[in-house]
């Protein structure tokens, strides 16, 4: 059986993969979809072909002999999208790492190189397969040269195969005559002119009858139809030129080494590193463990013997480095896994002499010691045992989050692949056989493996993550802010916030009464009953029955989105009633009804605070989300009345005043803004005075309100369109406001533009405390995506710095309350606001702590101001 070579048209397959797959980026913001698709197609064909040789040919960004022949050659091609362009050198790097021969030559196209090498192969008795999305290469098909063309059908990649026989059957011409077809019909993709008025059908008839353009020209009077005859007579020179342009040069002087092209092991250690970096998880499974110097799976054992267990715990107490995983069961802890450097990882199940209390007691001793401990979700472990707030405890999920805040999840197998170069079974693989992986219901062996792998990565991954954080300039952020925050958030979650259940019920009933009133009013004005919550039915009522302006019909009906209704509401009370109805029904379902389900036996709601969710570093809250309670409408604000302190306590609410604008003043160094804050001026009134060129004392409330919208909008990189929507003014007026604003504060404009440029260069934005936020959107060729990326680049340093400052303040306030042995506790954080459940006799002391710690959380060129209020409920305190 003959040997075989697989030849790949690099740009063609990369281009096809790019347009065939959705946008993918890795943690660095590198676009990877074309590279990923290319490798998938290549590996599929390699498995089918099993060649002895492999080479990939690429075009160079330089003129070829065809450009010298015809200036307009390929002149109509659109520029390559930036997201694809950046993947060209990347695929070459990956292929080089895989030891794949790459062929390029100045002055020639990849087609010429592929044709030449295929010809070499035939002469050597080697079969050739050419993989390309370009049908021009069909001219190369013979009995020993196979052209394979991938195409997508029904969302799946299928490959059409052409030897010479299949070309004749499909196109009614021989492979060599494909060139003749192009001579007559041209090729719009390559801007080969052909002759006017002749398409594929006519060209095929002519070439099938006469074999070549030369012979057809000799029999010109026989050519039909007349239009084609006249065109060939008048433009024969174009046909000859087109033939030269369409002919692949199979005698190009390419330097090609058969030895370099011989297939070896593609899955090298270098390739493995690339696949890890690019996050090609599905492809990592192809790597042979020996070839990639991959370690065997970490061994582990279940410990059930008392003497052995005691011995291991003693060793753990003396160990310098420990990895820990705690596995939850149906009711409490199910088991504990411990990894030590000198021995295998062990798993202690909760059974027999190893009660939950015994295991938790051992864990408490370890955390209380001075060992360096790596663990997953320290906050969750602290719910089960006492863990002192100290250095040397490393939460791997938080470390991984800081290094890539755009990911949705941070799992042990991801960290093992990314940072240890090891492939461990994922949670889904460990719990194979279960529809949904659940350690609470799995068998003991599966749970032991799951815990052991986590502990192993916790032990071996923490130092690698630490090094990565240090190299990224984020170690101080991790050690001084994010890890101490774990303890503060845990304290807040345990404390919870008291809710008056009866008040909540009454609030819901009050909402229900108003909702029913609105329903009746809406039905009466509409003249019929309909489903108010149905956009389709509402759209018909508004824009067909009531003939309101601005109706935009989509495939599913008229849009009744908030932005559409907001424009109509001032002039149509019916629409205002619809908007109020929507707001109140959401309030009732989300808060009046929703919050009731979260009230615990102690009468308190214990929300979960997340620090690894948002890309900017802001804390979020879930189950329930207490950070999203409405503030704009009075009925929404009233929900805060159900949150109350315990007897003998009041709420003390401390809120940073305009923290993001103050951060902007500091980061931009704008003298006028800094001066205004140092002199405690009304910043919005001052902005209105400067922008509208009127005396400070003559600024109207409307002008101040507009200036306020501009001030805060600038922080979020607002566009003229966005501002025009916010203020209900024309886009031109909004653009004028923004222009005047930047003329007033010129350094802000320079700063924001500079942040965008830095993010374009670095791939990420940076807060004052070193937090990185990748901005892959800046590399998009899509204008909307790129604009969004620019807004992220402007806002992330400001919002992220403000988030870091509030975290520092939270940590210090929480520590101070405990250090001074106060009964008062931090119970809630909402963006720039802290809520303290304060013992009445401690109000003065707690106020001083808040004032001190919040103002001193960061040293800025402007003062950090704090507004404080007390109240018998959250509503009064706010």
Residue ranges and their predicted role:
Residues 5-6, 10, 16-55, 71-72, ...:
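Conserved RNase H-like, two-metal-ion catalytic cores of nucleic-acid enzymes
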Residues 341, 533-698, 764-833, 848-852:
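Acidic, glycine-rich two-metal-ion catalytic cores of nucleic acid-processing enzymes
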